[in-house]
Amino acid sequence: MNASPQRRIGLYGGSFDPPHMGHLVLAMTAVQHLKLDELRWIPAGVAWQKERTLLSATHRAGMVKAAITGHRGFKLDRREIERNGPSYTIDTVRESQLAEPNAKWFLVIGQDQYERLPTWHEWRELITRVTLAVAGRDGKSPSPPSELLAVWHRIEALPMPPMNVSSTAIRAHLAAGGTAQSLVPDMVPTVVARYIDRYHLYAPPRGGVPAA
């Protein structure tokens, strides 16, 4: 009897505050380029390296669920928002691999995360457990931090097109009184814009836009 083919699973973590078209394009690129059977979107619970307060986990997970519905192979993974304490990627990887020890695992990250990876909790163990799949900035190939030069040959570079979109810019636009629908389709998917409008997320304080 032939053995079942090894499942290829990607882990895609982030604050997703909010999820935007850059996230979606990167996810679709990863699935296609890495031939993934499944890509798990993992909203961070307690993002220990973030200096600002995140939107509630309920809303961030809700926006991710809206964004990925209908996309084959995409799955929302709530483990980090349901876990107590800081959201360490190594814990997520260990738990995932314990549940499916025979799968091949990929960690999908962007250039910014890649550059900070040597500051992550137990990062040396992390890079032995997964294949890093890295999207370069502005459509360029990713550049490794010096600590990762020795394992550069084991890293998958994801061919991302240049994209001028960020969660920071989206939040600033909405906080200044802009509408979510005006960000469609270049910055956010329609379903995410509808979710933002439905719950009045990132809106300026009641009483109007703060004075400049």
UniProtKB/Swiss-Prot annotation:
Transmembrane segments: none annotated. The keyword Nucleotide-binding applies. Its EC number is 2.7.7.18. GO terms for molecular function: ATP binding; nicotinate-nucleotide adenylyltransferase activity. One of its GO terms (biological process) is NAD biosynthetic process. It catalyses: nicotinate beta-D-ribonucleotide + ATP + H(+) = deamido-NAD(+) + diphosphate. Pathway: Cofactor biosynthesis; NAD(+) biosynthesis; deamido-NAD(+) from nicotinate D-ribonucleotide: step 1/1. Pfam families: CTP_transf_like (PF01467). It is an enzyme of class 2 (transferase). Keywords: ATP-binding, NAD, Nucleotide-binding, Nucleotidyltransferase, Pyridine nucleotide biosynthesis, Transferase. The keyword Membrane does not apply. Coiled coil: none annotated. Catalyzes the reversible adenylation of nicotinate mononucleotide (NaMN) to nicotinic acid adenine dinucleotide (NaAD). HAMAP family: NaMN_adenylyltr. Belongs to the NadD family. This is Probable nicotinate-nucleotide adenylyltransferase. It comes from Methylibium petroleiphilum (strain ATCC BAA-1232 / LMG 22953 / PM1). The gene is nadD.
